[in-house]
Amino acid sequence: GIGRRKVSITIDKLSKEPIKWLPNPTKSYFADPFIVEHENGVDIFLEDHDIDAQKGSIRVLRLDNELNVTSEEKILETSYHLSFPFIFQHDGIWYMLPESGANQCVILYECTSYPFVWKEKKVLLNEPLTDAILFAFDSEFVLLYSRLDGTENRTVYYRTSASPFEFENTEKVLLADQPNIMRNAGALIKEGGEFIRPSQICNSHYGEGMQLNKLQRDNNGVLN
């Protein structure tokens, strides 16, 4: 489902606004939605997980301003699993950083005809990352992620760079290694001058819940 409301209202659980429920596919399920709003409506980029093949691809749903689906199309499919299609804009160009840990690397895609046509721009890191997000923080770019190494449900790392396209030779820094402060659950949110990072709760099982964490620097300039 999808609803429009301020983050502060959602946090306080005071919203009475209705949820618009989207059509449910029969042979797959949707997961990991990322939303782009524009004057004509909303685009939702998401994982389309084939139940029989047990493999995800990336699909976009186009909605009008009444949140009715007007079109949908599969936009990325590979021989390996894709999910978590984090999308961002830089210098007027849209980029996508889908989770491709099964391929032992993370690949950055560039949009050549929004929102349907994407081409591979470069391998951002030759590591099996999961749920990576990329954003500007202060005067640098931050790549925030977990690793598919058995610790992905409880540890989060980050790297910083002067460029959103160069992270290969940067230092890996541990953001958190404790229950509830875990792998990303979506894009960073800016609310009231603060940065909020949604994270997944996976203490007893995967998909247990979600929480919101304030992202800030300590006195030594380290993110936490």
Name each model feature, range by range.
Residues 1-224:
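Carbohydrate-active catalytic/glycan-binding domains of CAZyme proteins
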